[in-house]
Amino acid sequence: MVQRGSKVRILRPESYWFQDIGTVASIEQGGTIRYPVIVRFDKVNYAGVNTNNFAEYELVEVEAPKAKPKK
């Protein structure tokens, strides 16, 4: 299960970032959204964009988000 802050690998073959690793920026909770997961990358694509929306089945979690320290 991907969550905000997770490091994910992209499985969509037609994507510029195919097989690259990005960080989940947010996940939309609506049930009718086709690509609810916004992923941010370190490098930009041809248009100068560094984010893209993906479906959960197009992502594999590589690293879980870091736990926040308790106060």
From Swiss-Prot:
The keyword Membrane applies. Pfam families: PSI_PsaE. Stabilizes the interaction between PsaC and the PSI core, assists the docking of the ferredoxin to PSI and interacts with ferredoxin-NADP oxidoreductase. GO terms for biological process: photosynthesis. InterPro entries: Elect_transpt_acc-like_dom_sf (IPR008990), PSI_PsaE (IPR003375). Belongs to the PsaE family. The keyword Oxidoreductase does not apply. This is Photosystem I reaction center subunit IV. It comes from Mastigocladus laminosus. It is a peripheral membrane protein. Disulfide bonds: none annotated. PANTHER family: PHOTOSYSTEM I REACTION CENTER SUBUNIT IV A, CHLOROPLASTIC-RELATED, PHOTOSYSTEM I SUBUNIT IV.
